[in-house]
Amino acid sequence: RLRQLAIQHGEELTVCVLEKGSEVGAHIMSGAVIEPRALNELIPDWQAKGAPLNTPAGEDRFLFLTETRAYKLPTPPQMHNHGNYIVSLGNVCRWLAEQAAELEVDIYPGFAAAEVLYHEDGSVKGVATGDMGRTHDGEEGPNFAPGMELHARQTLFGEGCRGSLTKTLFQRFNLRDGVDPQVFGIGIKELWEIQPSLHRRGSITHTTGWPMDMKTYGGSWTYHLEDNLVSIGF
């Protein structure tokens, strides 16, 4: 969006993205249901440009499970998915990277930020990437390349849960003082190809209850994508 605004107003602005994965989307495993509202605002003609939002959300089901039975519950309003899409979030990220590249955003896949850089006044100056090509004992190998420093007016950290640099920022700027502790969850996901007779494209099912006990938060999902594929997880 920054590049769009810079082009619109005729201003020079460089935007750089560091992606630690081998490509954008390589570390995005989610099969997700997303609202297109932000995409409508960012790229209004996303459908014409071939965004991989191929499966409109259809039937919504919310079930309470016991060990032997499933009880259908009213779907909470915040879980209604009319107008949303079932997607592979990795594919969406790859497509967004293509759109960003067309706007001359500099994207560096395979580079992880290893250090936060600071100005003399203590404010964030940017980040430095890690050295590449060191041997197992830390010495410079034949293909050694030193890390590079990236300086910016604004630096955004999108490391996900417990990011290594984000933790240092928490400590330096006391960002966790006086706030609730973070909450983490662990889950599994698989992508199944099922028989066409069993596939209901656009179907969305969420469950709560069994096999969790009554004191533990958790649940499962089943999303029917295109091509007889089902994203299933817990």
What are these regions (language model features)?
Residues 25-27, 83, 137:
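A generic structural signal for short coil/turn motifs at secondary-structure boundaries
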Residues 70-89, 98, 126-128:
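Helix-loop-beta segment of a Rossmann-like dinucleotide-binding subdomain
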Residues 1:
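Glycine-rich adenosine-cofactor-binding loop
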Residues 4, 8-12, 16, 20, ...:
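Predominantly flavin-linked oxidoreductase catalytic cores and closely associated redox partners
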Residues 33, 86, 149:
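Short aromatic/basic micro-patch
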